[in-house]
From Swiss-Prot:
This is Short neurotoxin 2. Its main location: secreted. Binds to muscle nicotinic acetylcholine receptor (nAChR) and inhibit acetylcholine from binding to the receptor, thereby impairing neuromuscular transmission. PROSITE patterns: SNAKE_TOXIN (PS00272). One of its GO terms (molecular function) is acetylcholine receptor inhibitor activity. SUPFAM superfamilies: Snake toxin-like. Disulfide bonds join 24-43, 38-60, 62-73, 74-79. It comes from Tropidechis carinatus (Australian rough-scaled snake). Expressed by the venom gland. Residues 1-21 form the signal peptide. InterPro entries: Snake_3FTx, Snake_toxin-like_sf, Snake_toxin_con_site, Toxin_cobra-type. Keywords: Acetylcholine receptor inhibiting toxin, Disulfide bond, Ion channel impairing toxin, Neurotoxin, Postsynaptic neurotoxin, Secreted, Signal, Toxin. It is found in: Secreted. Pfam families: Toxin_cobra-type.
């Protein structure tokens, strides 16, 4: 009986994926792709232009931005690439 109960608990944890964390890209501009696990449920990609050209910043969450900065937020793994 204990074995059956333990099996049900393990199956429930695997099916619910309780340990799931979001994965977001976090490379800057044209750097090689890198990712990071995130506690937040979204990823972002900020884009703006300055004297260096187009700058791209990626990361976890969905931050507030100043006017003139384009922001794209999304909710799937590596969606901000």
């Amino acid at each position: 009986m204990k074995t059956l109960l333990l099996t049900l608990v393990v199956v429930t944890i695997v099916c619910l994926d309780l340990g799931y964390t979001m994965t977001c890209c976090n490379q800057q501009s044209s750097q090689p792709k890198t990712t990071t696990p995130c506690a937040e449920s979204s990823c972002y990609k900020k884009t703006w232009k300055d004297h260096r050209g187009t700058i791209i910043e990626r990361g976890c969450g969905c931050p507030n931005v100043k006017p003139g900065i384009d922001l794209m937020c999304c909710r799937t793994d590596e969606c901000n690439n």
